[in-house]
Structures are given as C-alpha cells and as structure tokens.
C-alpha cells in the first residue's frame, strides 16, 4: 500500500534521528533526551472515567508505558493525577477534538523521563486548594510539548526543588485563578528550557525564574500588577538566557515586562520586544540592553552554553507561531480559541479571572470515532498497513530502525515535526 505523505515525511525525519535520538522530532532543550515509556508497554485509554480500567488515571499509574487514546472528550477528575516514571502521553492520538482533563491538577514529581504532548490540563476552582494545575518538585528529564494548562489554584505550571533537565515548549500557561493567579515558579539549578510558549492572564510569575533557565521565543500577554518575567528576587544565584521574546501589555497590566531582579540574577538578553501601549496594534520595540530595562538584573555579555533551539525566531515570528500553534493545537478548544483572540486584540482584551465559568468552563469536545484497531496495540489497522506492521498482531512496541517504536512513529506522524 502506498504510504501517506505525512507518514513518509515522518519516517524520513526519524531515519535522520538515529544517531541522536530525542524524545520526538522537534524536541529541544534540557529535557529533549527523555525516553518516556519506549522500553515498556502500550496502554490504550478507552473511556473518559476518572479511574478504573481503561482510564487515563490508570494508564499513568504504572511505570514504562506509552499512553494513547481511543476516545476523545473531557475527563472530569476529583483528585489529583500522579504520574509514574517513564510514561509517554500522546494526546494527539485521540479522535475528535482530543482530550481535556478538568477538575483538579497533576503531579509530575519524580516522573523521570516523562514525555507529554497535545493534552489540555484545566484545574479549576473545584481543585485542591493551594495546589498547582501542574507541578514538578523532583525528577529528571521531562518534556512537555503542545500542552494547554490553565486555572491553577496556586501556580499554573511550576518546576521547583531538585527537578532537572526539563523542557516546556509550544505550550499555553494560562489564567491562574485569583486571588493568587500565578503563571509559575521556575526555580531549579537543574536546568529548565522554556521555548515558544504563551503566558497569558496571570497576575504574576510569567514566570518567576531562579536557577538555570533558557527563555526563548515566548509570548507574555496581559500580566497583572504582580509582574511579568520576575527575575529571581532572591539571594540565590541565577543564570539565564532571555532571547527573542515578546511582552504585550493587556488590560490588566500595570507594571513593566521585567521586575524584581538583583545582582544575583545574571541574564544574557538579546532582541526582546515590549509593546506597552494597549492600542490594538502589535507595534512594540526592542528593549535596550540595560539593567534598568530588565528589572535590575545583572546583564552579562556572553550567552550561556545551554541546549538551545535549532532556530531562533524574531519576536514577531514568535508571536505568529505561538498564536497559530501553541497549546494542544491539533484542534483548538473553546478556551484556547478565546485566549488567542485576546492576544490578537493586541492589548485591548483579556482579564484576570477567579472562576473558569467566565470562559465557559472546559467547554464540550467532539469525541470523534475511534479508528479500527483489530489487535488493540494502539495503532489503527490502516496505519499498520502503511507502516508494514501486522494489524492482527500486537507489535506496536517493536522498534523501528530509527530507534523509536512503531507506535511513536505513527503518533508523531499525526502532528508537525518542525516549527520553521
């Protein structure tokens, strides 16, 4: 059978990746080498239940799994989900409009080698008091790609403590709920990469950074009086690259893009734009390289040698990319659609919220129709025929010549593998 064009392109990309196997084509930064559940078993999520056989909670409760979906829709959870080590979650495999998890938060503490893609995690006011929508306090090598995170009751997405080698890329970190309303703490010496993300409608901590950090091609919109990028505000030493980002003031914004730096925060800065005028046009300008423009941090002249992006966009390119592709963008849900519309109002729309009902809650999703999968190995029969595997034999976890499993080859063919 003739291979489809997307699958042919995907196979070619994987063949080139043999010598330097990253989590998936397009994985970058400190967390790019996460292996997920590649050496384990497949788990197919077959229902939208909070718990039990076939549920997402059950899927991530054991180590060494690649999780795919034969169902789409909103999964309502009452308690936090705790993810085990070496788990891959491939939300792009869900039919219909994909997966939203709503009602409480997730813990990735000690979830070494996690790979998480194309899923929406929306906590909400009914979630655990004082908890993050997503949080990591310990663990090594994790990557989060095209994730939409919102409505945390403490932080929205925080990385703290002994966590190391983490990447968050192509994601949306939105609307931490009032009165706290925080984007997130990024506070570890172990290395965190933040690439091409959107921080939006968080009163403060967009993000608050301490330790070792690469912050490239992000868009920060409508931060509140607590601050946009908060530069440590600490006695601890910090070392960051801050490159090609765009800060756009919105209706809630009353302070400058960078605040609360000091001599302990060492920043290499280059080509960051700031649009403060809320005039309905994207017409910002480059921030001059001075400590005063960057919240009082200590400006350094040489870039830190951290794992960098393959291609550095201009700030304007970053805005175009983020508004089109950030978050669980295979199919944008009603929440992300509203958030992107706020950004594209260029300063005239946006709000800090205390109740997700303001956004219509998590909305409704088309569950779609699962493709036929005779052997139940997570790859639809038609895709197996194209891959050369057997639709009647559970063989999706066999390794392709690229080093990825056939399940990963198929799943990654469903979404773009490059961003430029």
Curated annotation (Swiss-Prot):
Q: Where are the residues of the annotated region Disordered?
A: 357-395
Q: Which UniProt keywords apply?
A: Calcium, Carbohydrate metabolism, Cell wall biogenesis/degradation, Glycoprotein, Lyase, Metal-binding, Polysaccharide degradation, Secreted, Signal
Q: List the catalytic residues.
A: 205
Q: Which reaction does it catalyse?
A: Eliminative cleavage of (1->4)-alpha-D-galacturonan to give oligosaccharides with 4-deoxy-alpha-D-galact-4-enuronosyl groups at their non-reducing ends
**Chief subcellular site?**
secreted
Where in the cell does this protein reside?
Secreted
Specify which residues bind Ca(2+) according to the UniProt entry for this protein: 275, 277, 279, 281, 286
What does this protein do, in the record's words?
A: Pectinolytic enzyme consist of four classes of enzymes: pectin lyase, polygalacturonase, pectin methylesterase and rhamnogalacturonase. Among pectinolytic enzymes, pectin lyase is the most important in depolymerization of pectin, since it cleaves internal glycosidic bonds of highly methylated pectins. Favors pectate, the anion, over pectin, the methyl ester.
The name this protein carries in UniProt is Probable pectate lyase C
Q: What is the lineage of its organism?
A: Eukaryota, Fungi, Dikarya, Ascomycota, Pezizomycotina
Name of the encoding gene = plyC
């Amino acid at each position: 059978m003739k291979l489809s064009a997307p699958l042919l392109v995907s196979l070619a990309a994987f063949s080139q990746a043999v010598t330097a196997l990253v989590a998936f084509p397009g994985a970058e930064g400190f967390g790019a080498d996460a292996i997920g559940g590649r050496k384990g078993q497949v788990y197919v999520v077959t229902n939208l239940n909070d718990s039990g056989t076939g549920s997402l909670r059950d899927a991530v409760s054991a180590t060494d799994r690649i999780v795919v979906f034969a169902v789409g829709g909103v999964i309502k959870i009452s308690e936090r989900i705790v993810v085990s080590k070496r788990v891959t979650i491939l939300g792009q495999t869900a039919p219909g409009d994909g997966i939203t998890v709503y009602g409480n938060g997730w813990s990735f503490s000690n979830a070494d080698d996690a790979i998480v893609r194309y899923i929406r995690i929306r906590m909400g006011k009914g979630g655990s008091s004082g908890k993050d929508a997503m949080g990591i306090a310990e663990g090594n090598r994790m990557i989060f790609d095209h994730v939409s995170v919102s409505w945390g009751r403490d932080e929205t997405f925080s990385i703290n403590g002994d966590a190391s080698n983490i990447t968050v890329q192509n994601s949306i970190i939105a609307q931490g709920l009032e009165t706290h309303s925080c984007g997130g703490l990024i506070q570890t010496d172990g290395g965190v990469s933040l690439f091409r993300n959107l921080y939006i409608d968080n009163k403060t901590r967009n993000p608050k950074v301490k330790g070792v950090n690469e912050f490239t091609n992000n868009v920060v919109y409508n931060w509140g009086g607590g601050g946009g990028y908060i530069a440590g505000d600490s006695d601890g030493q910090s070392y960051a690259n801050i490159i090609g980002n765009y800060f756009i003031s919105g209706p809630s914004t009353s302070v400058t893009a960078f605040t609360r730096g000091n001599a302990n925060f060492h920043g290499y800065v280059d080509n960051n734009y700031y649009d403060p005028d809320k005039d309905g046009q994207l017409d910002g300008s480059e921030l001059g390289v001075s400590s005063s423009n960057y919240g009082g941090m200590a400006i350094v002249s040489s870039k830190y040698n951290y794992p960098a992006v393959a291609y550095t966009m201009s700030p304007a390119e970053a805005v175009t990319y983020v508004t089109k592709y950030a978050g669980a963008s295979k199919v944008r849900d009603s929440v992300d659609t509203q958030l992107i519309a706020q950004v594209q109002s260029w300063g005239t729309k946006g709000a800090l919220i205390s109740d997700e009902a303001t956004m219509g809650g998590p909305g409704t999703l088309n569950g779609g129709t699962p493709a036929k999968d005779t052997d139940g190995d997570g790859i639809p029969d038609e895709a197996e025929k194209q891959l050369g595997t057997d639709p009647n034999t559970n063989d999706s976890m066999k390794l392709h010549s690229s080093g990825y499993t056939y399940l990963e080859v198929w799943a990654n063919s469903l979404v773009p593998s490059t961003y430029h």
